[in-house]
């Protein structure tokens, strides 16, 4: 039936109005998509398995000019691939070419005259990466057409130029799982005839849609964090080739046209003038091609390259020319636009194909200039690191594992990082070797390092001034994404900018994890302690899963001359089997956790190990509220952090099914961001209250915290602008005496607090509270939106985390002046005891993009430690 259905839809697709490449002859020995998949490039949305099968068929048909590389595998088991296309001579010695490309990328190792030889002989490498959002469908169709054209075209001088002067890397789909979801949903929603109505089922994706991957991540925000396997595989492949041009092909609203750079303001501070000049060269070439074919387009609007986690900006921070291409999306085979025109899937394929081929031709034409720009970028980066700060020192005494993970993540982006092997002297301090990492600044990735580690990346001043004017007039700002992302700030790792080399003995990190070596544990008379932190939390989650009994310290104590903080894990021999040392050693090694054997439990100061303040932990039974009305990203981030980051088993239950759940089967219920008023009525709210009183732990975040406060589950209120409580009536407007303050007179009487566009705000924590276990009392909190909550009163709960005062509030990014007084000293983490249980509320999403490691630790503290309290 499905095959017959597909045939019907193919027949109904309007015939293409233009050939992909008019007048081009193609080699019949190279298969078309129709021969492999049964449809043309522009006639049908090709499923991911058929995309891979077709590229494999192309590589097999032209083995002298193409090689299909498997770069990784998605969470759902689908392969991610990259097709490499070049001349027969170059492909025959591909490994040697790649080695030379990597040599060009590191000017420090080049001998006299070698740079000129490399520039003279090396190809320009252009990477075309497609479909990072699975429902942006035409780009993958274009990817297959691009590959076919480059391998099958005969007598085409432009293709000859491309093969002679360049290597082309084609990643056909960065998000196969999302594409598969879209194809299934779109096919299921189709009628007998194609339906162009925007409201038709085939255009209306059910939650969560195809944009996101299995864990509901936006993979176009993951380039530097690399939390997802799709990203890690792609980045590793690109670092193997060090491409000089990287184009990320997307889709946008069906009522738009086509976007290619030059980009909108603001640009990233670390982009060079020559990179911008070359971006203009590519823009002009695309404009000429589009004008020739009568295609509408725009640029210098909407899409900027400020945030370094995009497919356009991460490559630019490495020295490449990066670009985002956006095509209006039919979100199916045909869409009726608001102007009355019909947009087809085939139109999108044609437009992307045209831009992509124009790009590789332009790169080939300007090969030498592009290679020199790339080399100059990398060489000047090294020189920049020879003045100013010579080394960036990353350290965390309270959580060495946090610093280690940060260092490992930097290495994934090709950044050189060294692990300290001895104490490090810097700035009059001596740092322990454990948890200390050194980033030399005189390396080719200097600009990327500054992008990722500096506390603040400045934004164009004129642009910011215009946004202030817009905000004053109650117009939305034009900031496309967050304004801060400093990894040390979000990971609770101290950054020290050393003005001279520390001289400490170090070990260079590579792409393997540098774990603490606890391959064996000696027998201990009493048991073992595990100082709390990210490594310990992951180790305890596995230990509980494996049936090891663990207790948790509810207060500080001193034992054996060492101080231990709240949350320290206590694993007693008497609670466990005789093979505890072996089992615990294996678990600790996997996670890098420190384990301290103890032969007596006589505490000299602080809480005794047998105190009533020691709680017994059990593996928590966690329910994650799934589906609408949860915000897609928030649901996915929470599930990823639980299941993959910390190894916590989780049951995802759709919000619409909560009424059928026996809450007593669960210890923890997590409500991701969202307004649950429609899904959780009065009856379910009463059940949640009773469940908490019986010992359950409920966790809310961002918009679900606003919902919990509004319905009375949480004893605080969301504020309106100026501090008025949500729900209070504004005062009646009065006519002011003249003269008046015009802006004040026209301000609305009731509005949300000023929006914060993704800034990092200083958060202060009560380190005596178990929710703050593993922290040093101060972290960076990613604040995005208009949420401000009043502090909970002491008789109802504890404000475990609050924002700093106005003068110390902003760590990085933009917080508008009007927002600072209202944010300052307000809570971002509230603990409200409810009978024998808890309601734990975060003002923001602690799992933001899974790269806010410091607040993620607070979240997992709530999950692991809450049920035992």
Task: Label every PLM stretch briefly.
Residues 1-8:
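Sec-dependent signal peptide recognition
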Residues 13-141, 145-169, 215, 221-222, ...:
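Intrinsic-disorder/low-complexity accessory segments
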Residues 198-217, 728:
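Aromatic- and acidic-residue-enriched carbohydrate-binding clefts of CAZyme catalytic domains
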């Amino acid at each position: 039936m499905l095959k017959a259905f597909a045939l019907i839809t193919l027949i109904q697709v309007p015939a293409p109005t233009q050939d992909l490449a008019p007048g081009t002859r193609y080699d019949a020995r190279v298969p078309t998509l129709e021969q492999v998949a049964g449809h043309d490039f522009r006639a049908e949305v090709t499923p991911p398995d058929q995309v891979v099968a077709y590229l494999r068929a192309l590589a097999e048909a032209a083995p002298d000019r193409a090689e299909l590389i498997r770069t990784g595998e998605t969470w759902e088991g689908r392969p991610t691939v990259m097709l490499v296309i070049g001349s027969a001579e170059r492909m025959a010695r591909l490994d040697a070419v790649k080695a030379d490309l990597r040599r060009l990328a590191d000017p420090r190792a080049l001998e006299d005259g070698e740079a000129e030889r490399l520039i003279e002989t090396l190809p320009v490498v252009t990477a075309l990466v497609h479909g990072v959002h699975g429902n942006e469908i035409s780009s993958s169709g274009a990817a297959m057409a691009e590959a076919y054209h480059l391998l099958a075209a005969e007598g085409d001088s432009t293709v000859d130029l491309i093969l002679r002067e360049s290597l082309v890397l084609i990643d056909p789909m960065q998000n196969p799982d999302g594409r598969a979801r879209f194809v299934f949903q779109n096919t299921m929603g189709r009628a007998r005839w194609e339906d162009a109505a925007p409201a038709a089922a085939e255009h209306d994706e059910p939650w969560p849609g195809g944009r996101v991957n299995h864990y509901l991540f936006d993979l176009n925000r993951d380039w530097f964090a690399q939390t997802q396997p799709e990203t890690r595989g792609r980045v590793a492949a690109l670092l193997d080739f060090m491409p000089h041009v990287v184009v990320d092909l997307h889709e946008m609203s069906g009522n738009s046209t086509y976007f290619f750079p030059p980009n909108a303001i603001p640009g990233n501070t670390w982009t060079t003038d020559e990179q911008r000049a070359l971006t203009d060269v590519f823009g002009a070439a695309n404009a000429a091609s589009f004008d020739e074919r009568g295609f509408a387009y725009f640029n210098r609007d909407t899409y900027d390259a400020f945030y370094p986690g995009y497919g356009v900006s991460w490559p630019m921070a490495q020295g490449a020319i990066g670009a985002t291409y956006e095509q209006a999306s039919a979100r199916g085979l045909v869409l009726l636009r608001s102007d009355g025109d019909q947009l087809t899937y085939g139109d999108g394929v044609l437009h992307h194909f045209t831009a992509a081929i124009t790009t590789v031709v332009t790169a080939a034409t300007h090969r030498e200039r592009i290679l020199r720009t790339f080399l100059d970028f990398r060489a000047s980066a090294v020189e920049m690191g020879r003045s100013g700060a010579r080394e960036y020192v990353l350290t965390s005494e309270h959580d060495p594992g946090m610093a280690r993970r940060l260092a490992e993540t930097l290495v994934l982006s090709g950044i050189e990082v060294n692990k300290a092997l001895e104490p490090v002297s810097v700035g009059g301090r001596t740092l322990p070797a454990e948890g200390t990492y050194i980033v030399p600044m005189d390396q080719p990735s200097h600009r990327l390092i500054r992008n990722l580690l500096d506390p603040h990346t400045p934004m164009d001043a004129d642009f910011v001034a215009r946004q202030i004017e817009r905000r004053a007039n109650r117009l939305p700002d034009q900031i496309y994404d967050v304004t801060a992302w400093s990894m040390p700030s979000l990971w609770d790792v101290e950054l020290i900018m050393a003005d001279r080399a520390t001289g400490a003995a170090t070990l260079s990190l590579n792409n393997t994890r540098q774990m603490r070596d606890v391959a064996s544990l000696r027998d201990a008379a009493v048991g073992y302690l595990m100082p709390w932190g990210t490594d310990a939390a992951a180790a305890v989650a596995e230990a509980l899963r494996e049936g090891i009994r663990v207790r948790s310290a509810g207060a500080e104590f001193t034992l054996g001359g060492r101080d231990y903080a709240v949350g320290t894990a206590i694993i007693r021999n008497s609670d466990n089997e005789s093979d505890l040392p072996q089992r615990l050693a294996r678990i600790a090694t996997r996670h890098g956790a420190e384990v301290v054997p103890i032969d007596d439990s006589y505490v000299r100061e602080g809480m005794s190990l047998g105190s009533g303040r020691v709680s017994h932990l059990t593996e928590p039974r966690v329910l994650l509220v799934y589906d609408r009305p949860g915000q897609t990203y928030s649901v996915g981030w929470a599930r990823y952090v639980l299941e993959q980051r910390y190894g916590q088993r989780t049951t995802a239950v759709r919000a619409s099914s909560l009424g059928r759940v026996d809450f007593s089967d669960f210890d923890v219920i997590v409500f991701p961001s969202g307004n649950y008023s429609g899904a959780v009525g009065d009856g379910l709210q009463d059940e949640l209250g009773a469940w908490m009183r019986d010992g359950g732990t409920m966790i809310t975040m961002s918009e679900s915290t606003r919902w919990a406060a509004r319905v009375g589950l949480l004893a605080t209120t969301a504020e309106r602008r100026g501090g008025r409580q949500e729900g209070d009536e504004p005062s009646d407007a009065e006519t002011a005496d003249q003269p008046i303050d015009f802006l004040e007179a026209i301000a609305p009487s009731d509005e949300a607090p000023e929006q914060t566009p993704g800034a990092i705000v200083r958060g202060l924590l009560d380190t005596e509270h178990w929710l703050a276990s593993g922290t040093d009392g101060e972290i960076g909190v990613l604040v995005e939106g208009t949420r401000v909550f009043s502090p909970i009163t002491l008789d109802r709960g504890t404000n475990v985390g609050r924002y700093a005062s106005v003068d110390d509030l902003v760590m990085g990014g933009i917080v508008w002046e009007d927002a600072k007084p209202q944010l300052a000293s307000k809570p971002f983490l509230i603990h409200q005891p409810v009978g024998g249980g808890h309601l734990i509320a975060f003002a923001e999403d602690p799992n933001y993009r899974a790269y806010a490691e410091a607040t993620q630790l607070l979240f997992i503290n709530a999950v692991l430690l809450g049920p035992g309290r």
